[in-house]
Amino acid sequence: MSTTPLVSTAPLLSAEELKVAFPGRRGAATARAVDGVDLDIRPGEIVALVGESGCGKTTLARSLLGLVPPTSGRVTFGGAPLDYTGRALKAYRKRVQLVLQDPSGSLNPRHTVYDAVAEGLRIHGYAGDERAAVSDALSRAGLRPPERFFLRFPHELSGGQRQRVVIAGALVLEPELIVADEPVASLDASVRGEILALLLRLRDELGLSALVVTHDLGLAWNIADRVAVMYLGRIVETGPVEQLLTAPQHPYTRALLSVLPEAEGEPVVLAGEPPDPSKVPSGCRFHVRCQVLASGEAERAGVAEACRTVDLPVLNGGGDAQVACHWAAACGGPVEAATS
């Protein structure tokens, strides 16, 4: 679990009422992939965006990166609205870098390590000492001495080394924020801890911020300052990592935690699959799979009808513990943003 204090309380990156929708084929309903999200990331902060496959977290990350323009809402960086066109977007992408989950797919097999890391410098017209910048980035990523790796090709490296090359390619541009999409999912268990430790060290040494997209709450515990749990296009619970993972309020968060190896009690088996984002249920979007509603607990708390029919407002993007859940509100959970 990350414990480094934040450098600043002013957000570096903010999403406000962000929505991303994709039109359906042949007149089908629009898919609401991101359906109203507020999210702040502060300088030096690591935020884990957690949820099942298909919940919208990768689409949200791509929109924050400037790769997918929002349907509505806005993204700001350093207080300025993100311009999704032209030179402004190119300059933004230098400051915000992406690290993908599959290093083999991220690296051109015909390019040497040196060329892979130097590519960003060349795209952005770097006028300094290219060799020195590449060497420094490889060293920071844990590939030392860097000169030993210059002429190697991706197939000559281990999985962990390839991921370090990808990270070096992001670091070489001296970004302020890294978006890491499942950064250790394709790696052996023995290597995952090394890459997570590297990301934490880079935050401590460089003041980097990071958004880590993952389905694994265990990973979030090891690396994040704050967690945002996403379900069907919305963040349904957010807060400091220790508070959220030791005292989760939302039934969905509880279900995700219940399947971790160290969890006590029986795992929660959710009914069915996540609904189609083109057919978002009325009321709480989780209610059709909710174990609390199915067990009768919501009925006993007097909120079952609200669960089925009353939508919940978007949680604000700040760092306080918040949950969008009628049942949690009835039980006294931290839901001020969900009742405004």
Label each PLM-derived region with a short phrase.
Residues 1-246, 329-340:
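ABC transporter nucleotide-binding domains
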Residues 25, 30, 238-340:
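Short catalytic/signature loops enriched in Gly
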